[in-house]
Amino acid sequence: MALYILDDPGLSVQLPAKTRTEIGALRALNRHRIPSRPVGLADIDTLAEDPQAVLLLPQFHAVPEAVIRRCEQQAIPVIVLHTPGSSFPALHFSSVCGHAHSDADALLRYCAAAGRQRLALFAFNAVSAVDRSRAQAIADRATALQPEDLFAAVDSFEASFARFYPHRQQYDAILFANDYAAIAFIEAMQAADPTYLAGRFLIGAADTLLSRLYHTTVTTITYHRRDLLRGVATVHRTLLRDRGSVVSLQYQLPAAIAVRQSTQHFPLPPEAAPLPGSGGSTRLRFPEQGFFYEQDPVLGRIMATEDQLCAMDRTELQILLHFLQGDTNRHTAEALYISDQALLYHTRRMFRRAGVADKQTFIRFFARYVSPAHLTAYLHTHACAGI
């Protein structure tokens, strides 16, 4: 009855730090309810030898679709985290993920409790099914939202910001497709109109590492890890019990909001707080064209910073903190109780991943988006998280 967790260095996508922590927590279930084993891409076919095998994919876009199809051919149930099966009707897999309308309800309840009713949806990628479903779910729930309140990313983030800027005073809350867009917006608005951010709500999505470490921490829509673990355990148990009769299950994670500085730490409303009236089914007009965030010079730079942070272990995050604080190499090594050779090893790895040749360039690379105070708090909070 093992749960096989795909863990392969050949995965095409760097898993976020949060996802890697979740995988560690899932493996810890081995001591309680679910025996778990890591498995590589080359070993997928061997799972057929276990009549009770279930494969867990930590991220849909990290693996080829052929892996899911191969498991389907061999009657091996597949669970995918954070990707609804309805997004890929040609594939059969179970999912444990959030739901766009649940997220929309939580966001609108939060904004309404704070008296923020004039909403804008910013930097929603026209070619992203996730962005489109999230934006439409908000439009379905919000009373006053109109198609012109959607500022979709068509050609570049800067162009989207330029379209938004003349209308900025019309809104008291801006909801973003992800934390990267929220961070880019804060940076651009601080340069263009520093007083604008005070009193307004800016809410991202996905709870990235940068949302906690940026100079202005970003409130984000997310979920609780305990709900994810409960969801995986429930789906796994059901697939084993009804193996052969169940093709796929969809477990919906309850929405949660991580409240941070971009909403001035405004407290969450009571669960019983009423929602705004339904907006019916306002159809948002996404432009035909679109671009990928990775290709945008602004969003791509922020995503690259996130990737670099996710690739760092705890020692390297501590080294980064000391460097951002202006400490010398000698002081850094002494403070972390590591040798000069160990410090050199880690810094070379960090420089190579960041594509820089020296310490000062490395510091400039991260100082733009990482607050030493917030990194200190993160390291303290996650002292036992294995990061």
Residue ranges and their predicted role:
Residues 1-109:
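Alpha-helical recognition/docking segments in bacterial nutrient-uptake
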Residues 316-323, 350:
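Short alpha-helical "packing" element that flanks the helix-turn-helix/winged-helix DNA-binding module
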